[in-house]
Each structure stands twice: as structure tokens, then as C-alpha cells.
């Protein structure tokens, strides 16, 4: 069952000046989750994001990729109904990007609706079911992903997919 209706993960991970454990479990504490359940979920999630060895160090000491995985896990640990992501893998290495994409796919399969902004066409192809194409803050098209990449209805979307500059 969802503890939080909506969660948001920023492009630049936001860390509390606390340990990895405290950052990860902060939303559970706010939801007044029992301590035993907090410990169980923390153990599960630090394993999933490969941070078990550093669970008690300050989160601010992590690499950018580790911080982003922690920020995502902190959002997902609550089993949100809706997850909003702003360029969650921008400037991350390929390995970390794939790890994050796997977490997102698993969460979507388990019922979380994910809305993600991205400029990464490959990532959109791998993850999206539906594409909302925005240009200068205005919605230009909404299509199922398979159709969007085959037959985009927006001229700007067509240019973007082709790698052209969209003005």
C-alpha cells in the first residue's frame, strides 16, 4: 500500500545533512512508519541501490550517481502512486543510468505511475508508454510512445527525433 500519493525527484539530487540511512528513511519517519518496518525497508532498498556498505556515512559524501540512486530510492520506498522525475539520469554514467532505469521499470510494473521529463530520446524509447511533447512550455502532442517515434504528429517532435534544432 502507498504511504505517499506523490513523490518528486530532481535532476540534482537533494540530500539532507544526515546519513544514507536517515536520508533513505526520512519519508517513512514522516509517515510514522513503525521502526521495525523502517529497518526492513531500509535494508531492502540499500541492497537494491548498492549502498549497503555506506549506509551509516553522510549522504553528502556520496558520488553524484550514488546520491541520485539514493534520492530515487527515498521516493520509491514509500510506494508512491505517482512519481515525478526531472531529468533523473542527466550527466550520469551509463552503468548508473541503467541501474536507475531498472528501478523505474520495476516500480512502473508494480503500479507506480511515472511522469519523467527527459531530452534523452533513447531513454524515452526504452521507458515510455506515452509521450507528451513540450516545446517552450507548451504541449504540442500526446501519443503512445510506439506511434510517437514512428509517426509524430508535431513538426517540432519530428525535428527533435531527427536530431535537428527545434526553435
Whereabouts are the PLM-identified features?
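Conserved ABC ATPase "signature" region
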Residues: 36-54
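Conserved ABC ATPase signature
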Residues: 58-62, 66
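Conserved signature/switch motifs of ABC ATPase nucleotide-binding domains
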Residues: 78
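Helix N-cap at the start of a conserved alpha-helix in ABC-type nucleotide-binding domains
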Residues: 94-96
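H-loop/switch region of ABC-family ATPase nucleotide-binding domains
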Residues: 118-119
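A short, surface-exposed alpha-helical micro-motif characterized by mixed small hydrophobic
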Residues: 124-126
Amino acid at each position: 500500500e502507498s504511504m505517499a500519493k506523490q513523490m518528486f525527484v530532481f535532476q540534482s539530487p537533494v540530500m539532507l545533512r544526515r546519513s544514507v540511512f536517515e536520508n533513505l528513511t526520512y519519508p517513512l519517519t514522516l509517515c510514522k512508519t513503525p521502526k521495525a518496518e523502517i529497518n526492513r525497508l531500509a535494508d531492502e532498498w540499500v541492497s537494491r541501490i548498492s549502498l549497503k556498505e555506506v549506509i551509516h556515512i553522510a549522504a553528502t559524501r556520496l558520488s553524484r550517481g550514488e546520491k541520485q540512486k539514493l534520492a530515487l530510492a527515498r521516493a520509491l520506498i514509500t510506494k508512491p502512486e505517482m512519481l515525478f522525475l526531472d531529468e533523473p539520469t542527466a550527466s550520469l554514467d551509463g552503468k548508473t543510468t541503467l541501474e536507475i532505469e531498472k528501478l523505474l521499470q520495476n516500480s512502473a510494473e508494480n503500479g507506480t505511475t511515472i511522469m519523467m521529463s527527459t531530452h534523452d530520446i533513447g531513454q524515452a524509447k526504452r521507458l515510455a508508454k506515452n509521450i507528451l511533447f513540450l516545446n517552450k512550455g507548451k504541449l504540442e502532442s500526446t501519443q503512445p510512445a510506439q506511434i510517437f517515434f514512428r509517426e509524430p504528429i508535431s513538426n517540432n517532435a519530428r525535428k527533435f527525433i531527427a536530431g535537428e534544432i527545434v526553435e
